[in-house]
Amino acid sequence: MAPLIPRKRHTLRKSETARIHSMLEEEIGESAALFRSDRVEVVSTSAPWSIYLVDRRPLLMAGEDWVFPTLRGIVERPFPERRLVVDMGAVRFMVNGADVMRPGVVEISDDIRVDRPLQVVDERHHKPLAVGIALADAPVIREQETGKCARTIHHVGDDLWNLEI
């Protein structure tokens, strides 16, 4: 991925903030209240997604039809939804940006849906390692024995993780 370069930013209107919040609510339910704020800004960057600053911190990211917390958002305001737990052997691969492989997955939330974002956490400390896009629904992933189950789009140590605004 090319370096993440912030281009410009501006504060969202209340109607836009409400729309972003409702999209976040579709993804993580009632936990979206953790990310409610009077001041939400959007940052234009070189990334293929939008970055939203909540209280001047890059806590949300958005694709074409979804809004989901960044890793920094998950660390600062943890929530239980959309969680894929990987064993400790997968951690070193995840922090380098690898996709999630089924043999390393030990626990799968029931609310994981295909082409929707999810959080990847380690099994021992439950610390977030990555944000990914599910390649299948939760029941299908449970039945799988091999192969990829999520594509990583943001991981610890990448440009978005290190972004300072």
Language-model segments: residues:
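Beta-strand/loop-dominated core regions that host nucleotide or nucleotide-derived cofactor-binding catalytic loops
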Residues: A2-W49, L53-P58, A62-V106, D111-V114, ...
